[in-house]
Structure formats: C-alpha cells, structure tokens
Amino acid sequence: MEPQHDSTPQHGSSGVTVVGMGAISALGPTARHLWDGARQGQVGIRPVQAMEMNGLDTKLGGEVTDPVEPSRGYRHPAGFRERSIELALVAAEEAMAALPAGLVAPERFGVVLGTCNAGLLAGREWLRAVRDGEVPDPELALLVTPQALAESVGAAFRLRGPVLAVNTACASGANAIGLAADLLRAGRADAVLAGGSDAFSDVCFAGFNALQSLSPEPATPYDAGRQGLSLGEGSGMVVLVRAGFAREHGLTAVADIAGYGLSADGFHSTAPHPEGRGAARAIESALRLSGIGPEQIGYVNGHGTGTPKNDPAETNAIRRALGEGWAARTPVSSTKSMIGHMLGAAGAAVAIVT
C-alpha cells in the first residue's frame, strides 16, 4: 500500500461562493455561449484560420473566431497585442459585471490567474526583432513572463489586493480558483477574480506536435479510438466571495466552492502515472476538504484530453479515489471534445461549464 502524507484540512464547506462568471471560447464570446454550446453538444473544433498549420499533424483547433475587443486596456508596445491578455480581459469584464461598482474596496479585491503560455507571443515578437536586426521594444519584456497576465488584468480593473500568477501547466486555471478560495477563507481578501487564459501560438502547436499528441480529427476523450488532443484557446473567469458577504450584499450565488486538492505525480515530465496516483490524491483531498462522500457526486467533468496515456490514467485515478463501485455509477465526460484543450484556461472553463 502506498504511504499517505496528506495535511489537507478536514472540515466542511469552505463558505466560498461564485457570484460572477465570464468566458470566451470556441463556442462563443460569453459564459452563456459556453454553457449552452456544451449542453447542446456543439463542437467548436475546426480548421484554424489565424495561423499557418503547415507541417503539423493536425489542421484543427478550438479557435476563438469572435472579435476579441476588451473595453479595458493594458500596457503593450504599439502595433503588438498579447492575445492571452485580451482574451482574459474579455472574460473578466463579463465576470466582474456581476458586482456593483465600488462594492469591494480595491485593496480588498484580489486576482489569481493561471496560464501555461501567456507571454509566448511577446517572446516570439522579441526574437523576431532580434533576428531581423531590430532593437526589440522594451515593453515586450514586461509581457513575456507568465505573471504579466495577472498583473495586466489587475491593473486594468485597478485592483490592489493580492495579485498572484499560477503556472502549473494544464491545472493552472483550476488551481487559481482553489488558491483564490484560500485567500478568502484566510480573510486576505473580500473578493477575488480567478481563472485562466491562453492563446494559440505556433510555438505551442509545435511543442504538442513534437510530443505526437495532436489528433488529426476533433478530439474524442475516453473513446477507444481516440487519437490525441485538440488544442483550444480562450479564457474562463469567476468572481469569488465569502458566502456571508454574498448574503449580506444581496449577491446571487451561482455555485459554491466546496473544496479542492493539489498533488503531483513526480513520475514523468510529460506522461501521467499510469495508475493515476497523483490525480487520485488530489481528488481525495478535495473530498476531505468539502466533507463530501463519493456517493454524493453526480457527475465528473474530467480532464479528458483524448491522448492514449491520459484517459486511462485519469480513469484509474477516479476509480482509486471514489472506489470501483461509485466510480462505475458516476457519469464522466470531457468538454475538450467541444472546445479543445485550453491549457491554462482549461480548469476554469471546466468549472464554469460544470
């Protein structure tokens, strides 16, 4: 038996609630588009239009084709736009609209945002300038690092509470929501904007192509004939407050954050543990924190990338955490078959659509 070392607090509801949501994805420019599209089984994975796909194993992706035009600005060089930040601002503006202006003091309003690749486009532009014998615009240096996403969004809304950047690969958006709930439980903020954002880039596609992870057809998670993943882009954002704060100010609660868990496989740089050990520990931690038993789970929106190694490992993790009996009774699916794998935004988008 594997030894267990888990310091997760074992108590009931965290007392944290979602009062605002925003999203932009291949299914449309709002959280409502994401929700309705997922309910109807719409597939937003189609031929990518905004970049060359030559030499790749796929021509498809969950591309945002709606205009990405946030009303709030951010600091950037003339003639260059960092798409991941603009996607985040569009989703954040929708989520923040749920709160009356001035309800939360800027010093008590936090930001926790996750991303895998925000800044790649800025880095690519820097390298292009160097290659072409130009002097790169110093402003690009402010956008290259992952924290630029959280910093830019926080500044756009003039928020002066804790501003944190999460860069934990494909779990970034989900971890951001969990860490935001921790800030609220600890009394370090009265409201937190949390979520994730990532945009398409040729570097990202090339990386997954090198891993031989891309499917030539739209991804089919958990299917016996799955061929790999479909990349997606976009952003998902939620506004979290303590449940008591929501009641006191008459805010509509969309959902509660009952609990979350963090763990690592420590197994391989690109492959999950085949038995799903790390993922199972995260699920078990989330259940302990929330006080929820396996028999109370009505549905699992899984990671479900559609790769040959991920889906069996994740299935094993669910079985380990819930037990064979309850795992067999619990419906599991993945929205990545509709919006693609949004990387650092994936966990936030999954939370919204669930």
Regions found by a protein language model. Give the residues of each.
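Conserved catalytic cysteine-centered active-site region
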Residues: 10-14, 46-90, 118-179, 188, ...
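Phosphate/pyrophosphate-binding loops at sites that engage ATP/ADP/AMP, CoA/4′-phosphopantetheine
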Residues: 93-109, 156, 245-252, 282-299, ...
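Condensing-enzyme catalytic core mediating Claisen C-C bond formation in acyl metabolism
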Residues: 15-19, 42-47, 57, 218-290, ...
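N-terminal amphipathic, basic-rich helices that act as targeting or association modules
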Residues: 2-21, 80-105
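Alpha-helical metal-binding/catalytic segments enriched in His/Glu/Asp
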Residues: 180, 235-243, 348-352
